[in-house]
């Protein structure tokens, strides 16, 4: 298993950060991908194509909350039982406003409904679960605002 830490840069938000060059961190410029800010259309499948060669092992940073749905994309690359741990300051399980598109607000609900590999820690189907609030992340500057963990 190769560990690849990824920085997915959609809006150049990381340009002001003093991130040292490191062979174990892959900086991926995604600013050329269209139709992916807040809502992700089918044309933005390019995101999955760019992540796939690196795999999902490692720590991944993606821009802002507008791109939280990238976690959902990553779950599609795993073909074994997984648990999803989600800490966020807003729900990612809303009903979609636009059915054909995935948003930063509805991706987790879609993963729960569609990913056959997603299970609770006691191997009960997630479809039997009620949504739970796992925590509240402060919105202060310089603080991580959301944490998504895929366990398998």
Regions found by a protein language model. Give the residues of each.
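Conserved alpha-helical scaffold segments that buttress catalytic/binding sites
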Residues: 2-152
């Amino acid at each position: 298993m190769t560990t690849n830490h990824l920085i997915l840069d959609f809006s150049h938000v990381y340009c002001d950060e003093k991130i040292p060059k490191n062979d174990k961190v892959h900086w991926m410029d995604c600013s050329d991908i269209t139709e992916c800010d807040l809502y992700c259309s089918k044309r933005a499948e390019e995101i999955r194509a760019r992540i796939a060669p690196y795999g999902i092992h490692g720590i991944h940073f993606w821009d802002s909350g507008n791109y939280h749905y990238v976690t959902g994309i990553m779950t599609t690359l795993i073909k074994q039982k997984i648990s999803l741990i989600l800490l966020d300051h807003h729900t990612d399980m809303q009903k979609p406003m636009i059915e054909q598109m995935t948003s930063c607000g509805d991706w987790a609900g879609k993963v729960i409904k569609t990913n056959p590999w997603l299970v609770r820690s006691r191997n009960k189907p997630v479809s039997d679960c009620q949504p739970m609030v796992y925590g509240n992340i402060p919105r202060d500057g310089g603080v991580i605002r959301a944490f998504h963990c895929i366990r398998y």
